[in-house]
């Protein structure tokens, strides 16, 4: 009998498991894959601590970035945390002031740069491909290092990790009593589901409806390269957020339980990040498909990513790399 069971070993699940174990609870973390396959496996690793727009989210941003700055020392393993520039590119035909107004409520206000100023800050940018950019201070971690560091620290404190699939939650009467897995039952009165995009199907199998959704995210990873990208680059007008907002209508919620639907056409948010070991990840193409196991034409996807990225980062769009994909969860409340 454990005090807590955490389902899902991505950045959310492993962070929570570590903090609970550190607080003195007995914790079992259950993760399906020894090599992560969800959003934590393909994220850029950016920390948008500037983005808080309410008193609560601003407090979370303030406390969160302070925590990130000290974690490597506490864990004894480098998460590769660093402070970098974030450049949110503005399309050539967009109104910079209108784009800027979308960020007026942020905890830290951006600096509006014209195209030449943005290219001075990030020489890899194509001045003819942008109308300017918004500059933010930004945090960045290597998600693989972050998860690995927490995993080792969690286990040193006595936490347990089991790699198996959770089939459903165990409910007796009106009480949650544990989980049923491919390795049998594990008991606890406190279960936290941190399974990302797979949370919806897990909760449904347990008789619980939830408004959790997902996109199919696709990006390209390179090997370490000599080319240098100083900043994290992303679009100021992110199409993925528009996709998410357009697919969470409560009247259409049931369609997410029927595989085979494409709710909106795919879109690309052109951006890139270079990691400390000089690998570059660029993308991101997003699809809204109701089947988490849908087959995707990787050749077509890679071509679409390269076409859009090459418009703003031409040298990066031409780099050799490996196409990858994962599911990225989102909720109905913009969180």
What is the role of each PLM region?
Residues 12, 35, 198:
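Conserved Rossmann-like nucleotide-cofactor binding loop
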Residues 134-189:
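Helical element adjacent to the flavin cofactor pocket in flavoenzyme catalytic cores
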């Amino acid at each position: 009998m454990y005090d807590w069971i955490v389902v899902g070993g991505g950045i959310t699940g492993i962070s929570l498991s570590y903090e609970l174990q550190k607080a003195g609870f007995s914790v079992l973390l259950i993760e399906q894959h020894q090599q992560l396959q969800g959003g934590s496996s393909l994220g850029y690793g950016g920390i948008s601590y500037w983005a808080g727009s309410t008193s609560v989210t601003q407090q979370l941003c303030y406390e969160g970035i302070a925590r990130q700055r000290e974690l490597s020392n506490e864990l004894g393993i480098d998460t590769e945390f660093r402070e970098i520039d974030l450049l949110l590119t503005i399309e050539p035909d967009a109104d910079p002031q209108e784009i800027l107004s979308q960020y007026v409520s942020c905890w830290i206000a951006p600096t509006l740069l014209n195209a030449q100023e943005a290219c001075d800050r990030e020489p890899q940018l194509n001045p003819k491909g942008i109308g300017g950019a918004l500059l933010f201070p930004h945090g960045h971690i290597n998600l693989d290092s972050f998860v690995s560091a927490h995993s080792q620290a969690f286990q040193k404190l006595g936490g347990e990790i089991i790699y198996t699939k959770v089939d459903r939650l165990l409910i007796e009467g009106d009480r949650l009593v544990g989980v049923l897995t491919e390795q049998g039952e594990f008991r606890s009165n406190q279960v936290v589901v941190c399974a990302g995009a797979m949370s919806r199907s897990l909760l449904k199998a347990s008789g619980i409806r939830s408004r959790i959704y997902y996109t199919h995210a696709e990006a390209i990873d390179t090997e370490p390269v000599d080319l240098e990208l100083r900043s994290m680059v992303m679009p100021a007008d992110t199409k993925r957020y528009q996709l998410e907002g357009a697919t969470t209508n409560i009247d259409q919620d049931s369609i997410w339980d029927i595989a085979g639907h494409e709710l909106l056409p795919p879109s690309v948010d052109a951006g890139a990040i270079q990691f400390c070991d000089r690998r570059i990840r660029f993308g991101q193409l997003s699809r809204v498909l109701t089947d988490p196991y849908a087959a995707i034409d990787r050749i077509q996807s890679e071509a679409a990513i390269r076409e859009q990225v090459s418009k703003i980062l031409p040298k990066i769009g031409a780099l050799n790399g490996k196409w990858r994909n994962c599911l990225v969860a989102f909720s109905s409340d913009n969180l």
